[in-house]
Amino acid sequence: PVRLEKVRGEVRFDGVDFDYDSTPPGSSKGASKGTLRGIDLTVPAGGSLAVVGPTGSGKTTLSYLVPRLYDVTGGRLLIDGVDVRDLDFDSLARAVGVVSQETYLFHASVAENLRFAKPDATDEEIVAAAEAAQIHDHIASLPDGYDTLVGERGYRFSGGEKQRLAIARTILRDPPVLILDEATSALDTRTEQAVQEAIDSLSAGRTTITIAHRLSTVRDADQIVVLDGGRIAERGTHEELLAKDGRYAALVRRDAHLAPVVPAV
């Protein structure tokens, strides 16, 4: 296995296919949910990519391939030019951080839950990460602060709070590549704003791939890709895709429940 000492964070999908049941490409069997076909994409180090598309288009599957939760069934996925299948486990684990829709908290203190990401983190580092993730004030208001027990028999955090704890964990880990699978659950406006500010703190200076379920958060991405049936249907910036008036523009209209979108001149 290859050990990457210093990860810049370029991510490249080179003709990537993926099948949950490993149906050979080109077979007559219809594309199943989550199948990917012929994905060619490069996200430069420090760049941002947003992936959008209807349910079952393969968005979340795409995010699973970078940290090797699944392996590609065709083509290659490269980090800094190295196939992820050739990287040693430590290099890959240090290179890629994932903030998923599901955040698991252990029956332990808040501090221990955060320290899971970096066992040697100092108290100061934990507080700084929580502040960046917009969750410090809430933790500080709990009866035992960072020593408050959480989990099944302890304090129960809300969905938005859990998400910010996951972001704080990832800030502590400091990975060069970030995979962000947005929560589909509805958050109130204030919570959503806090979560978005936490995400902005986290993604600054990192290669960020966002699996977007709401389009309001993707317009600033360097590159937006629309997946449909496991293939790339459109790609470009927010403005370019609105001007095309294709699938992305239709998704934006549906998302905003607005009249036809007129791109800014």
Please place each PLM-identified region on the residue numbering.
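ABC-type nucleotide-binding domain
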Residues: 2-265
